[in-house]
């Protein structure tokens, strides 16, 4: 779990993915665009951050150890329901039957990996509203 800070006035994005190299890359890119970015390798770590920190948006994988992305989404809904509209799912498993129904039911952006950082940045701006 990494909570590096950017500028004090920046929006805080939580990156949830068990691919550590990917989250660290996204973290550096987001910080270069004046976002604060925290990382979590599991849904359990991410839930702890959501419960203890202000988060403006969540970029989340689906297939992760301990707590899958869809279950993390529902857990966040219990503790911070206002964040449900601020999820962006980024996954290599969008067509997996385990997740397909879930992804159709949520009204949030979903991107298949690999996705360009520019598309993520556009989506983040739309989700956060800046």
Each PLM stretch: what is its role?
Residues 1-12, 116-130:
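Non-catalytic signal-transmission and effector/linker regions of two-component phosphorelay proteins
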Residues 61:
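Active-site residues of response regulator receiver
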Residues 64:
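Receiver (REC) domain active-site loop signature in two-component systems and cognate sites
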């Amino acid at each position: 779990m990494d909570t590096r800070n950017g500028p004090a006035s920046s929006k805080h994005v939580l990156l949830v993915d068990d691919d550590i190299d990917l989250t660290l890359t996204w973290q550096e890119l987001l910080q270069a665009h004046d976002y604060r970015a925290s990382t979590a390798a599991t849904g359990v770590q991410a839930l702890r951050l959501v419960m203890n920190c202000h988060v403006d948006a969540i970029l989340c994988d689906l297939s992760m150890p301990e707590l899958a992305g869809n279950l993390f989404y529902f857990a966040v809904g219990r503790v911070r329901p206002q964040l449900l509209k601020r999820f962006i799912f980024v996954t290599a498993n969008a067509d997996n039957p385990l997740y397909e129904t879930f992804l159709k039911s949520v009204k949030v952006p979903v991107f298949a990996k690999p996705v360009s950082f520019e598309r993520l940045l556009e989506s983040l701006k739309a989700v956060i509203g800046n």
